Structures are given as C-alpha cells and as structure tokens.
C-alpha cells in the first residue's frame, strides 16, 4: 500500500509538539491523531472541542490526508481578541489624554 508523510503540531506558549509520521494513504485526520499517541501525551486535547486544521485551513476529522500535510491541533482562546483590542485602545487613549 502507498505511504504518505505527515506532521502533527500542537503548541503551547512556551513549548510545542511537532512530529513526523509515515501512514497509509487514505488515512483520515482523526485516525492519524489517534495513531500518533498525542492524546495520551496531552490529555487536555479533546477532539470534540479542539479545532483542527491543515496549514491553517479548518478541516473535519473525516478528511483524508495527503502527502506532506501538517495537522494542527488548536487550543481554545484564553481571551476574546476583540475585548483585548478594546482594552488596549482604551489604555492608549488614556495615555494620550494624560500627555495633553
């Protein structure tokens, strides 16, 4: 059977997991994740909650992998990006007001 080479990536702010695997052609995203053993190593990953992508493009667990794909397992956001921008803008406005 034909083989494909893929990578699986999972990142924290100060460290990351990136490993290469050789799998059978026709392997799905979910099957590759399960075969990799990453779920045992990082127990905070929940395939029902964590979003999955290939090169920053969202994918389904049932999608079939292609040679060279990099599966990325995304962590949930800890803060709302819009709220962070609002706070930063308010702080900057307060600093500007204080300089005048």
Curated annotation (Swiss-Prot):
<dbReference type="InterPro" id="IPR005346">
    <property type="entry name" value="RnfH"/>
</dbReference>
<protein>
    <recommendedName>
        <fullName>Protein RnfH</fullName>
    </recommendedName>
</protein>
<dbReference type="InterPro" id="IPR016155">
    <property type="entry name" value="Mopterin_synth/thiamin_S_b"/>
</dbReference>
<comment type="similarity">
    <text>Belongs to the UPF0125 (RnfH) family.</text>
</comment>
<dbReference type="Pfam" id="PF03658">
    <property type="entry name" value="Ub-RnfH"/>
</dbReference>
<dbReference type="InterPro" id="IPR037021">
    <property type="entry name" value="RnfH_sf"/>
</dbReference>
């Amino acid at each position: 059977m034909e083989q494909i080479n893929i990578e699986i990536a999972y990142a924290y702010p100060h460290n990351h997991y990136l490993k290469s695997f050789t799998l059978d052609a026709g392997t799905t995203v979910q099957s590759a994740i399960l075969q990799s053993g990453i779920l045992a190593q990082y127990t905070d990953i929940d395939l029902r909650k964590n979003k999955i992508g290939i090169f920053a493009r969202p994918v389904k667990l049932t999608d079939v992998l292609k040679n060279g794909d990099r599966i990325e397992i995304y962590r949930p956001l800890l803060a709302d990006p819009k709220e962070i921008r609002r706070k930063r803008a308010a702080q900057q406005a307060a600093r500007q007001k204080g300089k005048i």
